[in-house]
Structure formats: structure tokens, C-alpha cells
Amino acid sequence: MSQFINNKENIVTEAVDGLISTSGGALARLDGYPHIKVVVRNDWDKSKVALISGGGSGHEPAHAGLVGEGMLTAAVCGEVFASPSVDAVLSAILAVTGSEGCLLIIKNYTGDRLNFGLAAARAIEMGFKVNMVIVDDDIALPDLAKPRGIAGTVLVHKIAGALANDGGSLDEVTKVAENIIAGTKTIGMSLDTCTVPGSPKDQRIEDGKVELGLGIHGEPGFEKLDYIDAKQSIAAMVNKLEPLMSNESHVVLLNNLGGVSILEMSILANELVNSSIGKKLKLIIGPASLMTAIDMRGFSISVCPLTAQQEALLKSPCALSVWPDCKEITPIAIVDLPDGLTPVRHNPSKHDETATLITQCCEIMIAAEADLNALDAKSGDGDTGSTVAGAGRSIIAALEGLPLADHPKLFSAIGQELSQVMGGSSGVLLAIFFTAVGDASSNGASVIDAFKSGLNRMQAIGGANLGDRTMVDALSPALDALDNGLEAAAIAAREGANHTSTILVAKAGRSTYVNEEQLKGNIDPGAEAVARLFEGLSENR
């Protein structure tokens, strides 16, 4: 897979320079390229305890992106997933440590322990006050003698950084860091491994599987599970965390490992706060990307019980744009809809034949969901199938509340339902269509003529005509042929839909933004949906 890099050798130095040049002057680096890559606060005066962290790169924004007032004083950057050298760590200590001393915060990996530990020993020999804490929050492998340090490291940065910024002594800052480390538990999950720049991707995790407990360098976890959904993913992680949690109030960090969309992270957040540990969670950090694994399609959950002091330190401000702040978890606030926009309530009536026909139409659309999405992905945003299938499910769910025995009112009611439940332009257009069908039907028009009135209204407002590569290209000929029966309408709809694959310039709809190459040979998904509907009805008659 291609990546936005120049060459593998300069990845870290170029990334560090990009970070510094866009920091507004808040950051600087030591003059030691390429072997020494140390990011420091540009305003640091050595009057307080310094906090230094670091390790291999690839976990951004950790650690260089967490340098700033209220968190780290300096970050020592190694190459991707490789510990920095002893000299690089020592240079950071010497550059930022004053009379108050410094605290090294490292993750529990052999290279980091050795290199930071030796640098600390050398600095102490030179007369500097240096303490070191090791984060080991990973609970994925419970029998491991030396658990890994992962996203919980960020909590240590924030709490220790806030206390240091408030003027805490080295011993006080070290103690609060140790307390947080002792209480923090983290577990991760991913649908995929990460892609190390310049290297082939490890395809260890098969499609349909999710790995629980993998590391932030792509190290294998302890278990592969069948992927079901977000709820089950959270449940699997909570099952590991819950036995280790006390009854105290906790902070939770919901961390994006780099490749999960914001939309998905919000769904995971909802599942997390509603999980079996939800009542123990008082504060949340995230969802946010804080300790990543380059582009890993995964996330981690860190929990830690809180004292009043720790809570205050977590909530204290810090001058970092990447920090999402620590917020209270609150019930969802719901505001009443304005008058006129409350959910539609109809006068329901029963008509078994009509109910069967509507259900059949909806089921045809639901069955076509995957095919329509795949077709739409070639010339649009890939959601046509989900849109029409979702509308179909909503109509089925609302069926008992519809005026099934009064067709003019039924058409209008379907239009109102679609305007509320069906998104996108297709939802609006179909709402217009059925509302107009209802109007024409109430004025005595036959069903076919009412449908044609609906099409005319939809075209007048939407602006699409025959040949513009939209659903109109299938719907218009189908309605013209409907007097001759459903089979004739289905044939006409299919011919119209197939013809859209030869139309290389779309004049309406999202396809207007797509070039000819992508349109060539591909049927418009809206027209395909219409053809599928008439074909399905014809086959079942």
C-alpha cells in the first residue's frame, strides 16, 4: 500500500520538522540530526521538574506531540518502532533539567528500559537529579512477567505533567506517576495490523476476525475472535477489564490506534459508556488518537481509579491542541422537536393485501442492499443500498400505524415517513414523489396516473430528465408501460436502467461529479433500484 512519505530513511526527521514548523513557535529541537531527534518546549526555563518521555516513533502524537506546558518537557524520538540511543536520551536530560530535576517516563520495552536507564545513570553521575518510572499497563497477557506499556502512558504524562507544572517536587511528581501506573489497566483490539512505512503489511488478521490484546507495534495478541459488531467488541474488552476494577470512580481513555474513523470511535464510545462498567466511569478522555500504532484499525481502552488529587490534575488545562480534555460522562440531553416536526401520527387502518404488497416492495429493496451499495461505490459514495434498505425497514416497522385502507392518505403518509427516515437526496425525492401521488390520488386520479403525477413533481423539483442518468431513466419508461402489466413495466425499467451504463455524462445526482471512465459500463444505482423493484414485483405476481 502506498504511503505519503518521501523515503524510509528520513521519515522521522521530516515528521519532527513538520510538527515543529506547525507548532506556532511552541516547540524546538536539539541540533543533533539525524541520530539525535529530541523535541523540547521552546519556552522552557528549567525552573520546575522536567518530564521526559519517548521511544520508537510511529505512535504519534505520542510522544513528541505531547510536549507542551502541562505535559512533557521533552520527547526523545527513535526511528519507527525502535528505541532512541543512550546519547539521544542523555542529550534531552542535559538540555532540559535544572535544579529541580527530571522524571523519565518510559514504556516497558527492553530497549527503552536499557537506553533510558543507562542515560539516567550517566546523568546522575554528572550531578543531575533524575528519577525514572516504567509504565506497564497492558493486561492482554496476564502471565507475562513484564507487561507492555501502551496507551496508559498518556495518563501518566498528563497527571505528572500537571503536578510538575504546579510546582511539585521531583519526589512528589514521581510518586503520583507511580500511583497512576499501579492503577492503570489497558487492553487493545484491532481488525488489522499496522503498516510500517517502507515495509510490506502483515496480513495476520483475516477478514471477519478481530484480534484482542495486540501491541502497539503490531505484536500478536492473545486471542482472535469472530468479528460481530461494535457492541460485542466492547464487551470482549470489558470482560477483561472489569475483574481488575475496584468500585471507585474511574477515568477511561478511549484511544484510537490510528486507523479507525471518527464515526466508528463515537459508536464505540457509546457502547463503552453503556457497558457493564459504565457506572464506574466518571471521566472520559477521548475518543482520540493519543498513542497510535501508525494506521492500525483498532482502539484501546485504559481505565484507572481516581483520587480527588488525580482528578483535579487530569482536569487541569494544558497547552496542547491534540489533548481532548478530560470530561464528565453525562446522560444524553434531549431537546423537544420544534412544533410541526414531531414524528408523524396517522390514523391507522388495516388492509391485508396492501400490507402484503408494501412489505414485498420493502423486502425487495432490503435484499438488494449489498448489490446497490457495490454499484454506487463505482460512481458515488456507496450508500444507495443502505439508504433504500433502511427506508424499507422503517416502512415495515411503521406498517401497523399506516392508513392501509385509504390509499390516497397512505401515499401521503409514506411520503411523510420517508421525509423523516430516509436520508440523502433520494429520500427527499421519494418523499416528494409519494406526497404528489397522494395529492393526485385524492383528486380522483387512477393509481398509474397518480404515479405519473408523482414523477412529474419529482422531476420539476429535482431537475432530472430522461437521459440524465438517474432513477428517472428507469421509472419513467416503467410507468409508461404499466398499463400493459407489471411484466411490461419490469422490462421497460430494466432497459432504462441498463441504458444508463452507456450515458457517460451525468446531468443530475452525485454522478455529475464523476468522470466518464468511472461511469462507463456501470448502471446508475437509483435506476437499478427501480428496475429491481419492478422485476421483483413481476416475478411474484
Range-by-range predicted roles:
Residues 1-541:
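N-terminal loops that bind phosphate or other acidic moieties
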